[in-house]
C-alpha cells in the first residue's frame, strides 16, 4: 500500500529564495529530493511524495525545506498507521416483519439475488426470522422491539442488529445494486465501510439423543487490522434461526400481493405463484 502527501511552497517577503531544496523522508529514510533552484517572490510550487506504508506500524512522514538565504530549516511532520490487512466488512441482516406479509416476496427475491451476486455472496448474511412480538428474541432490547410493526406491513430489515430498520420498495422488484434507491445499493454502501477487525467464527452442533436436546459449541478468532493499544475485545455470539412459523402449524401460508403482476423476470417466479402460496418454506 502507498500513501501520498503534497507539500505546497509559497514564497513571500521582500526577496526570493536561493538554491531552494525540499526533502521527503519516511521513517527516517530518504524517499525524494527536489532541487527547486532560485524561487522568486510570489512563486508557488506543489510537490507530492509517494511512500510505501509499512503494514501494522506507525509511519512517520517528514518534509524538510531549505534555502541558502533562509536562516533555518522548515520541517513538517505527519504520521499514519498502516493496516496490517484490509478485512472484509461482512453484513448480517434480519428480516423482521410479521407473518403473512404479502410484500415479503420482494425481500425474499432481493436476498436471493444478492446471495448470487459475486460482490455480496461472501459477505452478506440474511436471516428471515419473522418476529413481531416481545420475547421471541432474547438478545433483542426493548427498544429493538419497539421499532417493529404490530401488524403485517411491507418487509422490514434490521442491518447489524441496529434499532433503525431498512426496507424494500417497488423499485426493488428489479434487482439493480447500482440504483441508489434500492436496498442492494444501500447494503453495498455498508459493506464498503472500513472495518478494523476480522472475526472468524466456527461452530458445531452437539446433539444429545437420550434427552432430545441440542447445544452449539462455538469458537471465534479475532484479528485487529491495526494495533489497538490496551484495547479489550469482547465477542458476542448470536444464534439465529430462519423461522417461518412452521412450529405447531399444519402448513405455512405466504400472502403474495405480487401474484399476476407484470414484472421483469417475474421476480424470480413470485409473480407466477398464487396468492396465497401454501406449504412454503423459505430459508
Residue ranges and their predicted role:
Residues 55-85:
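Terminal connector regions
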Residues 85-129:
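Local sequence-structure signature of Cys/Sec-based thiol-disulfide redox active-site neighborhoods
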Residues 23, 122, 127-283:
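Short, conserved sequence motifs used for protein processing/export or organelle targeting and
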Residues 9-14, 222-226:
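Asparagine-centered strand-capping/turn motif at beta-strand->loop junctions
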Residues 25-55:
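Intrinsically disordered, low-complexity Pro/Gly/Ser/Thr-rich segments with frequent PxxP/GP/PP motifs
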Residues 2, 44, 56-60:
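Extracellular Ig-like/FN3 beta-sandwich strand-entry sites
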Residues 2-6, 213-215:
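Short coil/turn motif common to extracellular beta-sandwich-like domains
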Residues 29-35, 73, 164-167, 246-247:
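Surface-exposed loop/edge segments in extracytoplasmic proteins
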Amino acid at each position: 500500500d502507498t500513501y501520498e502527501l503534497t507539500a505546497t511552497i509559497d514564497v513571500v517577503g521582500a526577496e526570493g529564495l536561493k538554491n531552494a531544496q525540499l526533502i521527503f523522508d519516511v521513517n527516517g529514510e530518504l524517499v525524494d529530493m527536489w532541487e527547486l533552484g532560485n524561487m522568486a517572490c510570489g512563486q508557488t510550487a506543489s510537490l507530492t511524495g509517494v511512500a510505501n506504508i509499512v503494514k501494522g506500524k506507525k509511519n512517520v512522514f517528514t518534509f524538510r525545506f531549505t534555502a541558502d538565504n533562509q536562516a533555518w530549516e522548515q520541517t513538517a511532520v505527519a504520521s499514519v498507521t498502516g493496516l496490517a490487512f484490509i478485512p472484509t466488512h461482512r453484513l448480517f441482516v434480519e428480516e423482521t416483519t410479521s407473518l403473512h406479509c404479502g410484500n415479503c416476496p420482494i425481500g425474499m427475491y432481493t436476498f436471493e439475488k444478492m446471495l448470487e451476486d459475486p460482490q455480496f455472496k461472501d459477505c452478506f448474511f440474511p436471516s428471515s426470522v419473522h418476529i413481531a412480538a416481545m420475547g421471541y428474541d432474547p438478545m433483542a432490547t426493548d427498544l429493538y422491539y419497539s421499532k417493529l410493526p404490530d401488524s403485517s406491513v411491507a418487509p422490514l430489515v434490521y442491518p447489524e442488529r441496529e434499532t433503525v430498520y431498512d426496507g424494500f420498495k417497488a423499485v426493488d422488484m428489479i434487482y439493480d445494486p447500482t440504483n441508489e434507491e434500492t436496498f442492494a445499493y444501500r447494503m453495498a454502501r455498508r459493506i464498503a465501510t472500513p472495518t478494523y477487525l476480522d472475526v472468524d467464527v466456527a461452530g458445531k452442533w452437539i446433539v444429545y439423543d437420550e434427552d432430545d436436546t441440542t447445544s452449539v459449541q462455538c469458537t471465534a478468532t479475532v484479528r485487529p487490522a491495526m494495533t489497538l493499544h490496551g484495547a479489550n475485545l469482547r465477542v458476542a455470539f448470536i444464534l439465529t434461526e430462519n423461522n417461518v412459523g412452521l412450529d405447531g402449524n399444519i402448513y405455512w401460508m405466504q400472502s403474495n400481493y405480487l401474484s399476476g403482476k407484470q414484472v421483469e423476470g417475474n421476480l424470480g417466479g413470485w409473480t407466477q405463484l398464487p396468492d396465497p402460496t401454501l406449504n412454503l418454506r423459505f430459508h
